[in-house]
Amino acid sequence: MSKTKDQRTAKTLEKTWDTLNHLLFISSCLYKLNLKSIAQITLSILAMIISTSLIIAAIIFIASANNKVTLTTAIIQDATSQIKNTTPTYLTQNPQLGISFFNLSGTTSQTTAILALTTPSVESILQSTTVKTKNTTTTQIQPSKPTTKQRQNKPPNKPNNDFHFEVFNFVPCSICSNNPTCWAICKRIPSKKPGKKTTTKPTKKPTIKTTKKDHKPQTTKPKEAPSTKPTEKPTINITKPNIRTTLLTNSTTGNLEHTSQEETLHSTSSEGNTSPSQVYTTSEYLSQPTSPSNITNQ
């Protein structure tokens, strides 16, 4: 009921505030006009009344707003007090047990939780127990297993050549003296001397360039062999001629009237056969070359 009353009063105050503002504006406009003295006096009185009513309305409005603020702060305080009463735990740390939770206020019924962390070597089991008292109830929770695993201690490094104190998974051949079964089972201990590492340089493979060839069928016409007819060369048998010349001269006249030359060429072949005789004139005889062996006495 109180909330509804506050809302009604707030609405009425807003309405009166608006109406009074309008009245002040109207009265100021009328006062500026040149009216009679009685009207001006009445307008001034109305303006005074309106201004005082505005002041009163403002005071009432501020007071109602303060009441609302106080109500909200009271509600917030009640809520915080309830939260404080219901919050059960405060966080502290214990170096031996780990992390533990406990509550300082023991007036109301509360729940307290204690978390005990054991050492990592011992496995813990989840245990939850509830203890009821007159005012408090406590619960204890322990984790099941630790999350971290124990690391195994590595044995110290031993010298490479001292094999007397090492435990082998096989039988070394140094123990076997003359036992054949021992020699069949044993293994030789490798020498752990650091050897030089052979660094192999990568060899570059030769790059083979391949050129694409157009394999097209070659259409070549076969060349025609020139047909040559065998020409029969004439066999010329040249025989050295035996020239016999007779010159007829006319001694009486002294002028060469008639010259006749009879040339008889007797050609003999390699077989001893004679060729037919030839008779030349003097002009033909002089034009042919003569050899000294073939010229006979005229």
UniProtKB/Swiss-Prot annotation:
Residues 221-232 have a biased composition (Basic and acidic residues). Residues 242-256 have a biased composition (Low complexity). It comes from Human respiratory syncytial virus A (strain rsb6190). Residues 140-150, 266-298 have a biased composition (Polar residues). Residues 1-37 are cytoplasmic. Disulfide bonds join 173-186, 176-182. One of its GO terms (cellular component) is virion membrane. The keyword Iron-sulfur does not apply. Belongs to the pneumoviruses glycoprotein G family. It comes from the Viruses. One of its GO terms (biological process) is virion attachment to host cell. Glycans are attached at residues 70, 72, 80, 86-87, 92, 100, 103, 105, 119, 135, 137-139, 144, 147, 199, 203, 219, 231, 235, 237, 250, 253, 269-270, 275, 282-283, 287, 294. Pfam families: Glycoprotein_G. The record marks 65-66 as: Cleavage. Residues 187-198 are annotated as: Binding to host heparan sulfate. This is Major surface glycoprotein G. Residues 67-298 are extracellular. The chain crosses the membrane at residues 38-66. Residues 132-161, 192-298 are annotated as: Disordered.
